[in-house]
């Protein structure tokens, strides 16, 4: 189970349920530092880890989110939205949309969707419409560098080279 606040992140645009549990499973500070090796590397590594580890239930507590230069210098946002799903990727994809971001902003989720052959049409939202609860979270000041996650051309050989 992964329970986390909706928040922006200094390397991967947002931290939601999947990243919360993936990084939380790493043993120590050194292991966590190893995956933070630039935008391309961290997004490929998180997608690779997501093939092996993932919560059975994700709860995104957005009653009060965190925006801006999180995790060190972020500030609260009163978003008053809570999301839950038994499908970890679906929860995060809807969560990032509620925060005002698109799937192509968050590499590890985009890769995870492609690996599982999922599309946005495969995700059913029950309850409020995204448009009715969406609140734009202020991104990290360095968001331009975070959006360089995409590997040119076919990313799968690079993905396959990432150690399990």
Model regions and ranges:
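Extended, low-polarity segments enriched in aliphatic/aromatic residues
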Residues: 2-164
């Amino acid at each position: 189970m992964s329970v986390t606040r909706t928040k922006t992140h200094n390397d991967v645009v947002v931290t939601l349920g999947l990243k919360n549990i993936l990084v939380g499973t790493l043993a120590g500070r050194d292991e966590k530092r190893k995956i933070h090796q630039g935008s391309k590397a961290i997004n490929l590594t998180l997608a690779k880890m997501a093939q092996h580890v993932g919560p059975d239930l994700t709860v995104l507590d957005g009653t009060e989110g965190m925006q801006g230069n999180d995790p060190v210098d972020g500030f609260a946002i009163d978003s008053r939205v809570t999301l839950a799903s038994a499908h970890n990727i679906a929860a995060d994809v809807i969560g990032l949309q509620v925060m005002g971001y698109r799937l192509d902003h968050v590499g590890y989720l985009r890769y995870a969707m492609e690996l599982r052959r999922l599309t946005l049409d495969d995700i059913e939202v029950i309850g409020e419409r995204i448009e009715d609860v969406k609140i734009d979270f202020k991104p990290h000041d360095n968001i331009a560098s975070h959006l360089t996650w995409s590997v040119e051309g076919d990313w799968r050989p690079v993905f396959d080279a990432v150690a399990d």
